[in-house]
């Protein structure tokens, strides 16, 4: 089984005041670095899904994949699936750049839950579909789904009967959408220290 990984960082961060969330720091480290360090060891190859100037990620040494048509996170998933398929991977594991505490066993648990088919993460009764596993075989169906104007990750997961992989720690999926979420993540870090 060849699993590739993708950090979703193609959003505009409007709730964060229009900041590129990848460039925010938590505990003195870039958010994109947090996610790269957690997801990278779980996959064979890792890339970043982002629009705008790719030079801002040069320090990470990872491929940067642009959306063909930015239409939400699924546009990034499609670019990632095409990249993974071209390199002979079986599936892509995605995690958003604003989820710094993403579990170190995300990929294997998603893989086990879905037995290689689509799977999404769940913790504390909430589903986190941007933390998901997508077989390369769904790429063209995703392209058609996006072309039909659909954009919801949860909707696409449901369309493929995605399995749910349960995780014990809700904080692992803490999503930094607004400045107060970043403050909460900083306070969790201080508690752990
Ligand atoms: N490739 C790609 N990723 C996206 C797109 N829109 C959102 N994302 C990513 O999907 C994840 C979840 O999106 P949000 O939490 O809404 O982030 P966002 O869109 O940057 O923030 P808001 O503008 O406040 O909604 C984040 O990691 C985003 O970077 C897009 O059009 N293309
Ligand atoms: Mg958004």
Swiss-Prot record:
Predominant subcellular localization, coarse grouping: cytoplasm
Gene Ontology terms describing biological process: bis(molybdopterin guanine dinucleotide)molybdenum biosynthetic process
InterPro entries per UniProt: MobA-like_NTP_Trfase, Molybde_CF_guanTrfase, Nucleotide-diphossugar_trans
Highest taxon, organism lineage: Bacteria
One GO CC term, this protein: cytoplasm
GO MF terms, alphabetically ordered: GTP binding; metal ion binding; molybdenum cofactor guanylyltransferase activity
Cofactor(s) named in the record: Mg(2+)
Cell compartment(s), UniProt: Cytoplasm
EC numbers for this chain: 2.7.7.77
Binding-site residues, GTP: 8-10, 21, 67, 98
Known catalytic reactions: Mo-molybdopterin + GTP + H(+) = Mo-molybdopterin guanine dinucleotide + diphosphate
Top enzyme class: transferase
Disulfide pairings: none
A Pfam family this chain is assigned to: NTP_transf_3
Residues given in the record as Mg(2+) binding sites: 98
Keywords of the record: Cytoplasm, GTP-binding, Magnesium, Metal-binding, Molybdenum cofactor biosynthesis, Nucleotide-binding, Transferase
PANTHER family, alphabetized: MOLYBDENUM COFACTOR GUANYLYLTRANSFERASE (PTHR19136:SF81)
Domain characteristics, as noted in the entry: The N-terminal domain determines nucleotide recognition and specific binding, while the C-terminal domain determines the specific binding to the target protein.
Function: Transfers a GMP moiety from GTP to Mo-molybdopterin (Mo-MPT) cofactor (Moco or molybdenum cofactor) to form Mo-molybdopterin guanine dinucleotide (Mo-MGD) cofactor.
Quaternary organization: Monomer.
Family of this protein: Belongs to the MobA family.
Identification of the protein by name: Molybdenum cofactor guanylyltransferase
The species this protein was found in: Cereibacter sphaeroides (strain ATCC 17029 / ATH 2.4.9)
Lineage: Bacteria, Pseudomonadati, Pseudomonadota, Alphaproteobacteria, Rhodobacterales
GN (gene name): mobA
